[in-house]
Amino acid sequence: MTLLFADLCAIFTPYRWMIEHVTTKRGQLRIYLGAAPGVGKTYAMLGEAHRRLERGTDVVAAVVETHGRNKTAKLLEGIEMIPPRYVEYRGARFPELDVEAVLRRHPQVVLVDELAHTNTPGSKNPKRWQDVQEILDAGITVISTVNIQHLEGLNDVVEQITGIEQKEKIPDEIVRAADQVELVDITPEALRRRLAHGNVYAAERVDAALSNYFRTGNLTALREIALLWLADQVDAALEKYRADKKITATWEARERVVVAVTGGPESETLVRRASRIASKSSAELMVVHVIRGDGLAGVSAPQLGRVRELATSLGATMHTVVGDDVPTALLDFAREMNATQLVVGTSRRSRWARLFDEGIGARTVQESGGIDVHMVTHPAASRASGWSRVSPRERHIASWLAALVVPSVICAITVAWLDRFMGIGGESALFFIGVLIVALLGGVAPAALSALLSGMLLNYFLTEPRYTWTIAEPDAAVTEFVLLAMAVAVAVLVDGAASRTREARRASQEAELLALFAGSVLRGADLATLLQRVRETYSQRAVTMLRVRQGASTGETVACVGTNPCRDVDSADTAIEVGDDEFWMLMAGRKLAARDRRVLTAVATQAAGLVKQRELAEEAGQAEAIARADELRRSLLSAVSHDLRTPLAAAKVAVSSLRTEDVAFSPEDTAELLATIEESIDQLTALVANLLDSSRLAAGVIRPQLRRAYLEEAVQRALVSIGKGATGFYRSGIDRVKVDVGDAVAMADAGLLERVLANLIDNALRYAPDCVVRVNAGRVRERVLINVIDEGPGVPRGTEEQLFAPFQRPGDHDNTTGVGLGMSVARGFVEAMGGTISATDTPGGGLTVVIDLAAPEDRP
């Protein structure tokens, strides 16, 4: 059949692509991951393309960003290129991936660089990775590149390290779902040398890059993040492989130490001992507490809380699992975590005690298989009764055996030794005690059997005439009847008390579990973390949160953890319905008992609440953004209306005066009116410039080019821009500015720095009339501080930060001093250059604005 189908494909050449497209599977995604730009991701991608071309694979390039690197561009030779599709936006044309052209060409492999790229507005999809999904669905293999800083889950960490917010992001799930992720890694020193030689950026950008993003510390931290992230993905892939192949044996690919604790006084000793064992082999440490599903062997929450705090302080993770058989639950958890070592505590027990009960530690060692077990003794180790360590099934069998054995033993002892000393009343009391023992062990049914057997043995062996079923004395008959009745009645009472005790303990354990899950939510755990905690606690293969919207035929997977998760209710081994039938918690693994479902129903409700809380937070965020935008619009209209009317009115009056024929103006008056017109136009120009800058900052399109900027030149250009064309007050105001910056140099964008200084000096001249405005600068270690100092009225203490908010003016009494955007624009420009700006009081009165920028690594 396969050969025939291939022959048909060869014959019908015009339809060959259609046949392959219909019958092919989804394409594979291969990603080259790097810690920073310039490590060689694109170079490695092109090298892989040439290797595949040599093997006869049909490879084309759709998007390859060479960034002007000659070696990279040379590797493009010999690879077919698919022309980009151009998208027009704001009067410019931008090249983007042409998905339709790729689908029409339908190669075996396509190269698409920079997977996290944001498409130009007007494209079919907002993000390039969404374009790639369409190509993969068509059965085409895609090779792409990603930098670690673009992963959504690591974005905040990278921003904290580098001080730069990454605008282009890609969901972690997209990269995790790739068929292959290969790390392209070089040392920070090698990358900096490559950068210095001009192999990454153009020569004019090298100094700025080396002193900012490409600092050795930044690169080292980014490299560590990339290595750890990839190690976690390799670990997850290994776990999935072991689950798919049903491998339960321990693979010592990575050292992991699991320590079992009860919450007793010995637990802290066990955790510290396990921490020392883990530190010697640089192993991961996990602390596990087993909760008995039957409610036995409980522990107080404060004791367990102290153990949790200790585990956290030692860098360990705390886990809780549910199981009736403690050794089995421990070993199942250890095998699931692929642990190599298990630490358990044991009490010092006598030889007789070990003879009748081998204990949890001994059973754990016997069943551990390839896991190394460390037995740690401690004087305060808890000694649970042997009966509490017996599984429910074993207790059930033992109670029925006791119903047969206990009366028989009592009868034998009584006949052999006690008969000649006791009467029928004392002998009946012995059997009565035996029935109580059986009731405590197994409940009403075994106790009833024990009472019946006790009556029969008492009648046959100890009642006259003996060894017959006949009862000669009426008193004996009454005694036996009363024995049976009282034994059964007391057994019912004892069983009820024992049941209530077990229910109370079980309720306590359920409360402990609910507190555990609720604590995770209160500590800010997301939905995936909560589901992972449920999966570990109940030893499930996978847990899925499913949402079935009203009227929908299929459910929507909100979140899932584990391997091979369920995607619908019918395929789940355990399905927990939440309230209104909208949410379901689906579990794949062992089927859970009814007592576990009670807790899980509450947990599933918490999970559904997290989903709804997240949605409400998003809606609230959108509403807040709309409200802020509306408030900003009203503030803008209120502030700008005056600043537009005032210069326009002044210019109109001046022009009207000059055009009148009734008055003959002197040359001096004419010059003054023309100066008024010029000053009004300058005010309007400055207002429009600030509005445009504010909108550019809000849109996030400011891309500063950081290089060595000499502050003396920047200040002089700022003064020129302020005084250009100015007359009267502004002309005299420029003369009040005293500059003392020496030969200070900062890493900055010269144009942006000029605008910042111009806004700050202009602001000082406005609000400190007739006062000297001083501008000085100096280097402090790796930073350059620029001070703009005035001796005017200053601002009220505690309101300094308000200066940098849009449409805020010192005092904010009227609109005669400007729209209030200058300081806001200055802060936006400074932060875009990686610096900070702040305001403080000038000693003796006034305001000092401090700009903090990076200094070049090498002094000039």
UniProtKB/Swiss-Prot annotation:
Enzyme class: transferase
A GO molecular-function annotation: ATP binding
Keywords: ATP-binding, Cell membrane, Kinase, Membrane, Nucleotide-binding, Phosphoprotein, Transferase, Transmembrane, Transmembrane helix, Two-component regulatory system
Membrane-spanning parts: 397-417, 429-449, 477-497, 511-531
Keyword Magnesium: no
Keyword Transferase: yes
InterPro entries (alphabetical): HATPase_C_sf, His_kinase_dom, HisK_dim/P_dom, HisK_dim/P_sf, Histidine_kinase_KdpD, KdpD_sf, KdpD_TM, P-loop_NTPase
One of the Pfam families matching this protein, by short name: HisKA
Function: Member of the two-component regulatory system KdpD/KdpE involved in the regulation of the kdp operon. Functions as a sensor protein kinase which is autophosphorylated at a histidine residue and transfers its phosphate group to the conserved aspartic acid residue in the regulatory domain of KdpE in response to environmental signals such as low levels of potassium ion, osmotic imbalance, acid and nutrient stresses. In turn, KdpE binds to the upstream promoter regions of target genes to positively regulate their expression.
Protein family: In the central section; belongs to the universal stress protein A family.
Name of the protein in its database record: Sensor protein KdpD
Organism listed in the record: Mycobacterium tuberculosis (strain CDC 1551 / Oshkosh)
Gene: kdpD
